[in-house]
């Protein structure tokens, strides 16, 4: 590794470990500089300390499943301290070995047992068991001791969610019951008072064939969020609404702008923050990378709920500040540079695009020969977030149906392009920019933390890197440069 690259990584790591803002889709780092590794999990707020504890699937290259459950703590939902594995795999164990499925863990405190209870989707690698696992601990960070893995009320259970009603403290499980023809439902089932077993089905979302369920509770309504079954490909997450958990529930409706595929994320959990000035609801989704699951990111966004309209919508911000005490959200303003201001090389060029921000888009970016360069970019001399707005239509054709096929007959899924990003021609500090697929005419953004020199003489050059298929970079609409986190 070159010294310049090492120095760049150290600067970026130090910047992100002292983060102040939430940046959806970025590489989030813990206080030790490592990437936060807590996929498809949930956040539990400890009543005694007020701290947030984030549990999730631990994934590394070569061990995408069965890695155990990691846990992090934070007082602000931004700065995350790692505490290792709350639930460690045990070699040869029938349900929590490295060969097993340990997915979508959730943790609640049981007043009856005075212990923390962790529940998850427990399975084998063929998804032939479809069970719910339980482990307990005296401490919220663990270690958790395995108790059992059971079939809920004799049924199947796949994607698992958990919800505690703020009105009476009752805990509920939400779970899809598999892909068999006899399944394809989502169940909402109450726990017993000890939170050691399920006792009664409250509602069944019959034959909608959805997964990744979780519930948002307002003072007047319940919203049940669920994902279509498209594997690790994103889709249009939907919500149902009801006045009571037992229903009647509304027809499902899409919660994000159509064809954004929920900003390339899957529902998994949500958090209600009862602030001193307002109540805020945060959608906590996973942005999966099926080519390298350990590189999957997190999409946390505020939800805008209108009780009169009975609606719930995700609100996109590249960068925002969340005050967990007051509940207030403040979008961070940046400086926009449009693609018409960029120069191109090789076969990259500006093309008319009526859907783009200035009616053009840079396309044809490929490898190191066909690139786009933004000039006169203002920098602070400190690490700054930069959002790259792009279009990538490699696999735009897949929808919300299970299975599906790539755009190309007999083709293979591509699902993302990878661009190279170089600041001020410093090739030794090249950054990789992952750009998930979009529908045609849909512009999404992907963030990077970059080191820009102080002043307005900076250049940002975008090329293409190998993504497993070719060296294409996504089409570029604009970039937005944000101030440093101070």
Which positions does each model-derived feature cover?
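Fungal secretory targeting signals
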Residues: 1-19
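Beta-rich carbohydrate-recognition and catalytic domains
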Residues: 17-210, 217-221, 226-261, 278, ...
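Short aromatic loop motif centered on NTY/YTY
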Residues: 161, 263-273
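Extracytoplasmic
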Residues: 323-486
């Amino acid at each position: 590794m070159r010294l310049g690259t090492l120095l760049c990584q150290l600067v970026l790591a130090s910047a992100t470990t002292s983060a102040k803002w939430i940046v959806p889709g970025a590489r989030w780092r813990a206080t030790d500089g490592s990437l936060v590794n807590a996929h498809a999990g949930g956040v539990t707020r400890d009543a005694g300390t007020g701290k947030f504890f984030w549990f999730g699937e631990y994934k590394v290259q070569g061990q995408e499943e069965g890695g155990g459950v990691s846990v992090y703590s934070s007082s602000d939902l931004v700065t995350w301290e790692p505490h290792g594995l709350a639930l460690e795999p045990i070699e040869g164990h029938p349900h929590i070995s490295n060969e097993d499925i340990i997915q979508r863990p959730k943790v609640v405190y049981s007043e009856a047992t005075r212990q923390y209870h962790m529940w998850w989707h427990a399975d084998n690698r063929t998804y032939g068991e479809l069970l719910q696992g339980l482990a307990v601990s005296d401490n919220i960070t663990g270690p958790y001791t395995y108790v059992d893995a059971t079939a809920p009320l004799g049924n199947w259970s796949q994607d698992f969610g958990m919800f505690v009603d703020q009105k009476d403290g009752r805990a509920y499980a939400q779970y899809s019951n598999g892909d068999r023809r006899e399944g394809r439902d989502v169940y909402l089932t109450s726990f017993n008072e000890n939170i050691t077993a399920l006792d009664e089905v409250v509602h069944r979302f019959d034959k909608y064939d959805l997964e990744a369920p979780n519930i948002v509770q307002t003072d007047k309504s319940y919203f049940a969020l669920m994902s279509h079954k498209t594997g690790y490909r994103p889709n249009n997450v939907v919500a149902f609404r009801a006045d009571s958990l037992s229903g009647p529930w509304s027809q499902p409706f899409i919660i994000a702008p159509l064809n954004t595929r929920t900003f390339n994320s899957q529902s998994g959990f949500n958090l209600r923050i009862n602030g001193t000035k307002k109540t805020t609801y945060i959608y906590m989704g996973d942005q999966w990378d099926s080519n390298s699951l350990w590189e999957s990111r997190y999409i946390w966004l505020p939800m805008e709920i209108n009780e009169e309209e009975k609606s719930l919508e995700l609100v996109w911000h590249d960068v925002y500040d969340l005050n967990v005490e007051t509940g207030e959200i403040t979008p961070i303003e940046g400086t926009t540079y449009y693609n018409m201001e960029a120069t191109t090389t090789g076969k990259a060029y500006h093309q008319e695009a009526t859907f783009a921000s200035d009616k053009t888009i840079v396309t044809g970016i490929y490898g190191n020969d066909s690139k786009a360069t933004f000039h006169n970019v203002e920098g602070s001399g400190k690490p700054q977030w930069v959002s790259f707005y792009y279009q990538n239509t490699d696999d735009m054709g897949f929808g919300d149906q299970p299975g599906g096929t790539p755009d190309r007959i007999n083709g293979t899924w591509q699902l993302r392009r990878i661009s190279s990003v170089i600041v001020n021609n410093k090739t030794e500090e090249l950054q990789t920019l992952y750009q998930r697929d979009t529908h045609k005419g849909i512009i999404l953004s992907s963030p990077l933390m970059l080191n820009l020199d102080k002043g307005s003489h900076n250049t940002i050059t975008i090329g293409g890197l190998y993504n497993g298929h070719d060296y294409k970079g996504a089409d570029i609409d604009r970039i937005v440069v944000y101030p440093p986190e101070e």
